[in-house]
């Protein structure tokens, strides 16, 4: 069985029932200037129990496609956001 990819990010918004949008930051080296720059990407995550709120830090794990853009399932909520 292949290892499932895990991503960690911050919940931006609840995109609907059982769906959250998370922002994932990664650091890559610039090819010319050899400086680390931040790159951001948004993912849709399946939240079966509707337990996330905007600002939460979460971990999601890759799964089978649940919709056209949703390929991750919520694994854990690491920290609650300040509201």
From Swiss-Prot:
GO terms for molecular function: rRNA binding; structural constituent of ribosome. GO terms for biological process: translation. CDD domains: Ribosomal_uS17 (cd00364). InterPro entries: NA-bd_OB-fold, Ribosomal_uS17, Ribosomal_uS17_bact/chlr, Ribosomal_uS17_CS. The keyword RNA-binding applies. Keywords: Ribonucleoprotein, Ribosomal protein, RNA-binding, rRNA-binding. It comes from the Bacteria. GO terms for cellular component: cytosolic small ribosomal subunit. It holds the Pfam family Ribosomal_S17. PANTHER family: 40S RIBOSOMAL PROTEIN S11 FAMILY MEMBER, SMALL RIBOSOMAL SUBUNIT PROTEIN US17M. Belongs to the universal ribosomal protein uS17 family. Part of the 30S ribosomal subunit. One of the primary rRNA binding proteins, it binds specifically to the 5'-end of 16S ribosomal RNA. This is Small ribosomal subunit protein uS17. It comes from Campylobacter concisus (strain 13826).
């Amino acid at each position: 069985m292949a290892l499932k990819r895990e991503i960690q990010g911050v919940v931006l918004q609840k995109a609907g029932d059982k769906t959250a949008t998370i922002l994932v930051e990664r650091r890559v080296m610039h090819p010319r200037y050899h400086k680390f720059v931040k790159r951001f990407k948004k993912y849709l995550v399946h939240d079966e129990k509707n337990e996330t709120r905007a600002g939460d830090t979460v971990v999601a794990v890759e799964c089978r496609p649940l919709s056209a853009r949703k390929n991750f399932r919520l694994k854990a909520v690491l920290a609650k956001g300040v509201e």
